[in-house]
């Protein structure tokens, strides 16, 4: 039996390598052959247990979803809430890369155990399934896929996480089965967030593992006490904190280490140390291993940085193995070890797509790069991947990892999130001298998924996304692998704000209103295209992205942004938004000899990291006369605009000296009339100049919508909706 398994593997791998460079359809067919052969061969050796697997699926409850609402031909849905219990062989080749897995406690079989929440939305009638399993990687414990693809999603985070809101039911009308799983070990409970139980690393002599932790602390209102994990992106939702080894912050440890607390006004400002006697570990009443007290008060708009010795790190890298093993279980396994049947449609004809937004998109890229899209049986786990607004990497596989951290120009600026390699294909980094690509490991064993990389303009402005499109110095466009498509959504921000926008200043923490240009319509079209590629072997549209070659991706000092004055259009007072040509600079960061930047893995000992001399070449979108991005997917809102939409905004001056306003774009409306814009000194044509009649506006919307449908970047049903809105409402009064 084993010989037959090996023969199948060798034959298929040899054949696949011979034709892998051929056209998309040949490559996709061979990948399918390899996947089917691996699946079949894995069934031949069921007597040999996998070295990493889900051993028990504990079903907590199964019930009708969405109040019994029916969705087109699919009918009704059910929601299933469960816990998956898994185990890992720390000595297996696919698990050895996990940081500290050798220090994790083991069960009687020598395995490392974990338990993860699982949530499923499935057609009540399995025959109505579209044979697509969509795996949702939660963002800081919260489900995101429904919010990405279903329109009209209104409700609370708790309701979204409990699968109570379906919006317009887009995914359900398709017959898609949705599976979400927890992976992040430091998310605090609440709002029905998904939780995971991961082991704590322990030294072989039973003593606690310790190490240095750097925690950037911020607050939106004055306070005297914070949790040690209270960063910009780790306070809401809350994250647990690594414990300090000592609550007396004035005590010098045996090796000479003493914790420090500093403050600065912006990321590149000098750190000013706060005297050790002016702060303490605790809530200002009681000493605590997980809190900090500053009697003088933590202030908004400042970056506080605590560097302390922590203990008991969670083995966070197991999160990648969870993604691998949960995906493999639901696609290929008939039942768990206790006889509980697989609750979703599965088998060789069923295809899987993994998607995640922002933090979760970086998780997907890192999971693939570290080799976790290969199951223990040797086959590809996820057939397709759709990382959304996640251009960097996820520093999860690190001792004392802080996966809730991000990569802002001001906030979380120098946490590990952007280590070379940046591109899916191989590039050579002239700064580090390494040659590498994110798909190296999966290319070696033919387990790469078909990838739709989705990003916004903000990812280019603040998220360093251009490094995924060019060589490391930004001098030329990088070749794109055949299994990858990239779609940059022009003039969009990281995630659209809730509407209506604030009518009067202050506009949140930003200088002007945020950018409401939605992702939904482009994301829906992309999803259908990816499903067609994965399931039906339909060649997808070519990538749509700005480029160096055509002049739509340029250095920031070459952007021709218009001079837009302060205005009072519609009775809303808006200041002039000054274009500064700023970018979110990036140098090689040295976190110490225990950190492996090629894998974004290891142990951080240099905190803060030492910054290298050479800088990577960051590029941004060129714009038209209205300040709207020229390259990328220009949706209906940009083809028939009512204002300028950008991928950047600025903080109010009292926050971080006016640097990039975290993950926010800008909306600057046009004047209603020619007279109004001339009085304001606005160079952009007014609404009446662009659309002298309602019919002219409807015609403009229809023309853009038709071109997007032809390009397969807008679904026909969404074209009808957008044109109907234009016909009913005329020129949009707001974003």
Q: At which residue positions do the language-model features occur?
A:
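Bacterial N-terminal signal peptides
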Residues: 37-45
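Short, low-complexity, charge-dense intrinsically disordered segments
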Residues: 11-14
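Bacterial N-terminal signal peptides that target proteins for export
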Residues: 25-37
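Sec/Tat signal peptide C-region and signal peptidase I cleavage site
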Residues: 48-52
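C-terminal His-loop and adjacent cap/lid subdomain of alpha/beta-hydrolase
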Residues: 53-735
């Amino acid at each position: 039996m084993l010989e037959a398994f090996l023969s199948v593997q060798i034959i298929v791998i040899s054949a696949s390598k011979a034709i892998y460079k051929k056209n998309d359809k040949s490559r996709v067919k061979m990948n399918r052959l390899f996947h089917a052969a691996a699946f079949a061969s894995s069934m031949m050796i069921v007597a040999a247990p996998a070295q990493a697997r889900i051993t028990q699926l504990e079903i907590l409850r199964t019930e009708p979803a969405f109040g019994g609402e029916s969705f087109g031909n699919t009918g009704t849905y059910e929601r299933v809430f469960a816990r998956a219990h898994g185990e890992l062989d720390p000595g297996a080749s696919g698990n050895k890369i996990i940081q500290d897995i050798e220090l994790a406690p083991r069960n009687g079989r020598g395995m490392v155990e974990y338990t993860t929440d699982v949530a499923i939305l499935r057609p009540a009638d399995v025959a109505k399934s579209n044979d697509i399993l969509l795996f949702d990687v939660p963002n800081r414990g919260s489900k995101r896929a429904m919010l990405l693809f279903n329109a009209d999603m209104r409700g609370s985070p708790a309701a979204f996480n409990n699968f109570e809101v379906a919006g317009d039911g887009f995914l359900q009308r398709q017959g898609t089965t949705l599976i979400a799983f927890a992976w992040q070990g430091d998310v605090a409970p609440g709002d029905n967030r998904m939780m995971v139980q991961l082991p704590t690393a322990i030294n072989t002599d039973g003593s606690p593992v310790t190490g240095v932790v750097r925690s950037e602390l911020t607050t939106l209102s004055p306070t005297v006490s914070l949790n040690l994990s209270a960063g910009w992106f780790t306070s809401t939702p809350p994250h647990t904190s690594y414990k300090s080894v000592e609550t007396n912050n004035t005590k010098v440890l045996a090796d000479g280490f003493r914790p420090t607390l500093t403050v600065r006004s912006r990321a590149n400002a000098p750190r000013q140390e706060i005297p050790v006697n002016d702060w303490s570990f605790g809530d200002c009443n009681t000493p605590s291993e997980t809190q900090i007290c500053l009697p003088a008060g933590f202030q908004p708009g400042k970056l506080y940085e605590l560097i302390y010795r922590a203990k008991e790190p969670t083995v966070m890298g197991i999160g990648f193995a969870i993604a691998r093993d949960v995906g493999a279980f639901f696609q290929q396994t008939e039942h768990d070890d206790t006889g509980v049947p697989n609750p979703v449609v599965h088998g060789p004809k069923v295809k899987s797509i993994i998607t995640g937004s922002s933090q979760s998109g970086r998780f997907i890229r890192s999971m693939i790069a570290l080799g976790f899209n290969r199951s223990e049986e040797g086959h590809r786990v996820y057939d397709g991947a759709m990382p959304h607004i996640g251009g960097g990497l996820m520093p999860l596989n690190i001792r004392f990892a802080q996966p809730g951290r991000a990569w802002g120009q001001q906030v979380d600026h120098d946490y590990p999130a952007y280590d070379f390699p940046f591109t899916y294909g191989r590039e050579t980094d002239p700064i580090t001298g390494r040659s590498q690509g994110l798909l190296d490991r999966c290319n070696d064993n033919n387990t790469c998924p078909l990838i739709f990389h989705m990003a916004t303009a903000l990812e280019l402005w603040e998220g360093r996304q251009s490094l995924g499109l060019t060589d490391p110095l930004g001098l030329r466009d990088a070749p794109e692998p055949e299994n990858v498509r990239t779609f940059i959504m022009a003039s969009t921000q990281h995630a659209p704000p809730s509407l209506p926008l604030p009518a009067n200043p202050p506009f949140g923490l930003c200088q002007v209103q945020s950018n409401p240009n939605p992702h939904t319509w482009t994301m829906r079209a992309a999803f259908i295209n990816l499903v067609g590629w994965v399931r039906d072997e339909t060649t997808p549209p070519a990538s749509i992205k700005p480029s160096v070659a055509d002049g739509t991706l340029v250095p920031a000092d070459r952007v021709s942004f218009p001079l837009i004055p302060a205005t009072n259009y519609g009775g809303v007072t808006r200041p002039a938004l000054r274009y500064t040509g700023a970018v979110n600079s990036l140098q090689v960061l040295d976190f110490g000899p225990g950190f492996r930047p090629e894998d974004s893995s290891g142990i951080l000992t240099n905190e803060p990291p030492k910054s290298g001399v050479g800088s990577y070449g960051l590029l941004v979108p060129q714009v038209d006369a209205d300040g709207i991005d020229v390259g990328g997917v220009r949706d209906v809102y940009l083809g028939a605009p009512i204002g300028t939409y950008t991928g950047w905004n600025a903080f109010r001056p009292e926050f971080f000296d006016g640097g990039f306003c975290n993950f926010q774009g800008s909306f600057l409306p046009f004047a209603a009339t020619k007279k109004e814009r001339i009085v304001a000194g606005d160079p952009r044509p007014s609404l009446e100049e662009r659309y002298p009649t309602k019919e002219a506006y409807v015609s403009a919307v229809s023309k853009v919508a038709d071109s997007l449908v032809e390009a397969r970047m807008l679904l026909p049903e969404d074209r009808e909706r957008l044109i109907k809105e234009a016909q009913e409402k005329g020129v949009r009064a707001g974003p």
